[in-house]
Amino acid sequence: MGSCARLLLLWGCSAVAAGLNGVAGANSRCEKACNPRMGNLALGRKLRADTMCGQNATELFCFYSENADLTCRQPKCDKCNAAHSHLAHPPSAMADSSFRFPRTWWQSAEDVHREKIQLDLEAEFYFTHLIMVFKSPRPAAMVLDRSQDFGKTWKPYKYFATNCSATFGLEDDVVKKGAICTSRYSNPFPCTGGEVIFRALSPPYDIENPYSAKVQEQLKITNLRVRLLKRQSCPCQINDLNAKPHHFMHYAVYDFIVKGSCFCNGHADQCLPVEGFRPIKAPGAFHVVHGRCMCKHNTAGSHCQHCAPLYNDRPWEAADGRTGAPNECRTCKCNGHADTCHFDVNVWEASGNRSGGVCNNCQHNTEGQHCQRCKPGFYRDLRRPFSAPDACKACSCHPVGSAILPFSSVTFCDPSNGDCPCKPGVAGPHCDRCMVGYWGFGDYGCRPCDCAGSCDPLTGDCISSNADVDWYHEVPAFHSMHNKSEPSWEWEDEQGFSALRHSGKCECKEQVLGNPKAFCGMKYSYVLKIKILSAHDKGSHAEVNVKIKKVLKSTKLKILRGKRTLYPESWTNRGCTCPILNPGLEYLVAGHEDVRTGKLIVNMKSFVQHWKPALGRRVMHILKRDCV
């Protein structure tokens, strides 16, 4: 088998050994685990050697070759001079095409005992195997080293010697499989054309997955060097009485083939030049293997070693070369309000290893792990999709009529609808006017009219019921005074905002607790102990937010303790809101359900009294004894 045929076979075998043949190649769409094409890493890069033949002056050198029957031919001699290209044998000759330029070689200076050949790479690469073809007899001893930190530290790949034990004190892999030293490639025959072959993933390495941590540790390199430690003579020289020994005292190498590929963790099938790298132009130096991956599977980095900025919802993983699983990075759910996210292991574990992405620097006035809610001082505009940049609108609470939250100097609105918390006697979604029966819009809200009827909302002067009067005092327009530096708060916190109080002209004839049979005869749907949190004038009706502290009775309704909304009889029906429910106070309320809407109604048929423990015990006694 010829030299070229041997090289082709070795390249194919090494690709199989590296476990890469089952992975999608450069012509695939990289839908599964994939890898860039393999090639000679020495092509287009500078090979360094300590010396070169004729580097100081013209030198005469000789070499032997054998016939097919291993009989010696007469030596051939020639001259070398590094200053003349047709007589030079530089290190770059080892990295030209072994097929197009098979008879070019590097040669050391005469009578050199130790020599070094080194390849420096501009990035991390996957190295699979080395093939060296010598023009001189192969060394009696040499070492192949690698570096993974750009030459700061080195680690041996393999020792080569005619006698491993005598030279290095190591066992021979000819005797012990997997030993780090071998005598397979140290025979002086053939005197020219002898090969040294090293496979980075020879047994005992498990090569099922070429992207596993163990395999990466074995294959990743930034530098590769060969230390030639001991020359040996061609046996033909012993029988040649006319030979001059010093003419044969050199190392010479035809080819230095470093087979490998761009290192992409199984997430790319093509690579680009590393920034700043310029390949060396040399005869036959085609198809340079570059080192910067064109990442797929939502990965990023020179080696696809981390997830792309908005794809950190699961931990980054290398692709699985055994199963072909791409292990894609997954997009974070940021609702269109963030450009980047990060992976949080605590969030990941709390979700049962389903989602760990946390959005960074939420935009468009949003906040939260997924930018899923509006910031304090903004509310959700339900007319816009939440992914829209203008989905969160600034609160427009009037700075005078709106209530200030405890421990804060800023007024916030309900983030779900933009409603503002009003001061006592103030009404409107933006708290910008006095309620009916109130006057004097100011820093303390609005004051009740001190009249039998209504009053002027500006002056408080009593007016007759027949007067043509504007019941609402509109306040001039204003601009939001939201301060973004204020601390955030939760709307659900218990607050005592303004109540919807009746005016002086309104009479609320509320139910009293008298005859138990009359109380039971009302057939109330619910009986509750509540605390008034806030009340809101909606124009056509009112809503009272309460905290249910105890459920004394609940028929068909499923009422739980917690926050709920009550719906008093509309002021448009009576000119005021009845019964009276003031914020911060506790009441015992018995009422009915609106069968059409399921709302809890409070009207003139309802029983509403300030809560007292004795009242609660009495009502419970009636419910258990009489209302059965």
Curated annotation (Swiss-Prot):
GO terms for molecular function: laminin-1 binding. Residues 1-19 form the signal peptide. Coiled coil: none annotated. CDD domains: EGF_Lam (cd00055), NTR_netrin-4_like (cd03578). One of its GO terms (biological process) is regulation of branching involved in salivary gland morphogenesis by extracellular matrix-epithelial cell signaling. One of its GO terms (cellular component) is basement membrane. Keywords: Basement membrane, Disulfide bond, Extracellular matrix, Glycoprotein, Laminin EGF-like domain, Repeat, Secreted, Signal. PROSITE patterns: EGF_1, EGF_LAM_1, EGF_LAM_2, LAMININ_NTER, NTR. Glycans are attached at residues 56, 163, 353, 483. It is found in: Secreted, Extracellular space, Extracellular matrix, Basement membrane. Residues 506-627 form the NTR domain. InterPro entries: Laminin/Netrin_ECM, Laminin_N, LE_dom, LMN_ATRN_NET-like_EGF, Netrin-4_NTR, Netrin_domain, Netrin_module_non-TIMP, TIMP-like_OB-fold. Residues 30-261 form the Laminin N-terminal domain. Pfam families: EGF_laminin (PF00053), EGF_LMN_ATRN (PF24973), Laminin_N (PF00055), NTR (PF01759). Disulfide bonds join 262-271, 264-293, 295-304, 307-329, 332-341, 334-359, 362-371, 374-392, 395-413, 397-420, 422-431, 434-446, 506-576, 520-627. Its main location: secreted. Residues 262-331, 332-394, 395-448 form the Laminin EGF-like domain. Expressed in kidney, liver, heart, ovary, testis, retina, brain, olfactory bulb, and widely expressed in embryo. The keyword Hydrolase does not apply. May form a homodimer. PANTHER family: NETRIN-4, NETRIN/LAMININ-RELATED. May play an important role in neural, kidney and vascular development. Promotes neurite elongation from olfactory bulb explants. This is Netrin-4. It comes from Mus musculus (Mouse).
